[in-house]
């Protein structure tokens, strides 16, 4: 079983999978009479049909026991999905490039620092949210609309991956 290495989350490293949502290193402009910096369009919400809409939700996640065997990844073929931590806690991001099925050798793991969110592009394979603390909260922005928008891929026993706590 391959043990996954954890990388720090950066815009450059995560670019094949979507956008990192963060203010550090991002452009802004002043609004509200100069009292507020607006970091504009840090990520793009993707939908696939005119009747689709972007929605905002909150997920409350529990920490999964570590080490964690990665048995499954999911993707959303009809829209992007963004996760922004609300409590400032680090979290893990497990991803693989879009395609018919994720390949174990292409799976990567990133550690968000608690001040960064991620926006998975449509079709990017990813593990469900991986909080490191119980009852951690995430703002989630994704697509709502007709049609199935969650495909799951289960790895064969010889393809499963192991993730240790950072």
From Swiss-Prot:
Cofactor: Ni(2+)
Catalytic reaction annotation: (S)-ureidoglycolate = urea + glyoxylate
Primary enzyme class: lyase
Superkingdom of the organism of origin: Bacteria
One GO MF term attached to the UniProt entry: ureidoglycolate hydrolase activity
UniProt-listed SUPFAM superfamilies: RmlC-like cupins
Keywords noted in UniProt: Lyase, Purine metabolism
Tagged with keyword Lyase: yes
Pfam family, one: Ureidogly_lyase
EC number: 4.3.2.3
Cystine crosslinks: none
InterPro entries cross-referenced by the UniProt entry: RmlC_Cupin_sf, UAH_cupin, Ureidogly_lyase, Ureidogly_lyase_bac, Ureidoglycolate_lyase_dom_sf
GO BP of this protein: allantoin catabolic process; purine nucleobase catabolic process
Pathway in which this enzyme or protein is active: Nitrogen metabolism; (S)-allantoin degradation
Assembly description: Homodimer.
Function: Catalyzes the catabolism of the allantoin degradation intermediate (S)-ureidoglycolate, generating urea and glyoxylate. Involved in the utilization of allantoin as nitrogen source.
Family membership noted in the UniProt record: Belongs to the ureidoglycolate lyase family.
Protein name per UniProt: Ureidoglycolate lyase
Lineage, broadest ranks: Bacteria, Pseudomonadati, Pseudomonadota, Gammaproteobacteria, Pseudomonadales
């Amino acid at each position: 079983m391959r043990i996954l290495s954890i990388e720090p989350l950066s815009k450059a490293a995560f670019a094949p999978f979507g956008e990192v949502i963060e203010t550090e290193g991002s452009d802004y402009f002043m609004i509200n009479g100069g009292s507020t910096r607006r970091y504009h369009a840090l990520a793009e919400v993707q939908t696939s049909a005119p009747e689709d809409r972007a929605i905002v939700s909150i997920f409350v996640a529990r920490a999964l026991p570590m080490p964690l065997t990665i048995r499954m990844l999911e993707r959303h073929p009809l829209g992007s999905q963004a996760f922004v931590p609300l409590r400032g806690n680090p979290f893990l991001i497990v991803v693989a490039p879009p395609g018919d099925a994720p390949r174990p050798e292409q799976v990567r793991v990133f550690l968000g620092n608690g001040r960064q969110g991620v926006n998975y592009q449509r079709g990017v394979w990813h593990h469900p949210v991986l909080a490191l603390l119980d009852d951690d909260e995430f703002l989630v922005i994704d697509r709502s609309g007709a049609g199935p928008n969650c495909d799951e891929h289960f790895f064969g026993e010889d393809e499963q991956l192991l993730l240790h706590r950072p």
